[in-house]
Amino acid sequence: MKKSISILAILGFCGACISFYIGAGFATMQEVVQYEASYGSLFIVAIIVAAIIYVYTNLSFATNGNRLNLKRGGDIYGIYCGVFGQKFGNLAAKFFDYFSALFCYMSFVVMCGGANSTASQQWGLPIGVGAILLTILVISTVIFGLDGILNTLSKIGPIIIIMILFVSIITAITGLPSLSSNMASVDAGNYTNVMKQVGNGNPIASGASYGGFVILWFAAFLAEIGAKNKLKDVNIGMLLSTFFIFGAASICCIALIGHVDVTAASDIPALELAKQISPIVAQIFAIVICAGIYTSAVPLLWTGVRKISHEGTKEYKLITIVAGILGCIIACFIPYKGLVNVLYGLNGYLGFILIFFMIVYDIKTKMSSK
């Protein structure tokens, strides 16, 4: 008898993956600029590389989490790294486990920075207000644990991607007359002084770095979701999210390059695109950006806190509050654009190292099962 699939569950997992992926960097389009659009005509190369990494790694996380019935998502690192011997595996796994938790927490700080920049650029609010409001909402959600997080993310994700597509499709069309000349200008390096770029001019390295930093976001999250739910539903939902995420990224690149004269130097390029449509759309989209920041900030803080405390305990709640407040304070003193470039770029390359362990483990497991 065939195992049935649940359409609602698939859409829920798809929405959760979209929500987790589309945080401050994507919703503001700052990471799209740095990883993809800054490569001009070669942006599609970076997108394809990142998409391949996204699909393979997330299938592996969910499948192995389910197969091994992992109780804690972070244990997935020990599984992959143990393929090179117990002693080395334990050391490498411990490094990735703690480092990924720290990276997820620092990515939460990036989200706070994104909230600050959005609130300041669109509404003229003082630096700190956006981060404080975000932190209050995130702490309140994380305290409810993984089930509460999934419930929240699955509902908000589709709304965010629809609004991003709405703005990017319209501005991609209005920017078409300038696309060719702007693309040539970006290719010629005329915007290198204002457009930060990951990969040092290599779109393959940029795509690898982009896929790499997302690995460290999704590893524990999807391994635990895979362990607790029907694997087929999780994997189909994740694959569906790939189409929406990277399809949206491609359209965003066309829109950003088509209007590169106003987007290149902006902290929040997405707002500049929305303003090309109308001020009202910009106001609405600023709220959507905040929602995107929130949906990524929640599981990022959860992953960091979950590493050092058990969900539901008093200690877990206290650490959630303290870590949230500390991240908010840090974000108020470090520029947002610099946070995205340095933190995401460096950790992307480290995440890519994990892929090597994953490939070796998955091949070995596949061969031993024959």
List the predicted regions and their residue ranges.
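Hydrophobic alpha-helical segments and their helix-loop junctions in multi-pass secondary transporters
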Residues: 24, 101, 127, 138, ...
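Transmembrane alpha-helical segments of multi-pass small-molecule transport proteins
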Residues: 10-20, 45-52, 94-101, 121-145, ...
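Flexible loop linkers connecting adjacent transmembrane helices
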Residues: 30-40, 61-88, 259-277, 308
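Membrane-water interface regions at transmembrane-helix termini and the short interhelical loops
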Residues: 34, 113-122, 135-157, 227-230, ...
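Hydrophobic, membrane-embedded alpha-helices of multi-pass small-molecule transporters
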Residues: 7-27, 46, 100-104, 108, ...
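Selective recognition of specific alpha-helical transmembrane segments in multi-pass small-molecule
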Residues: 46-60, 108, 159-171, 211-214, ...
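Hydrophobic transmembrane alpha-helices that form the core helical bundles
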Residues: 60-81, 87-124, 283-311, 335-345, ...
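Extracellular loop-to-transmembrane helix junctions
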Residues: 7-8, 34-62, 235-250, 343-356
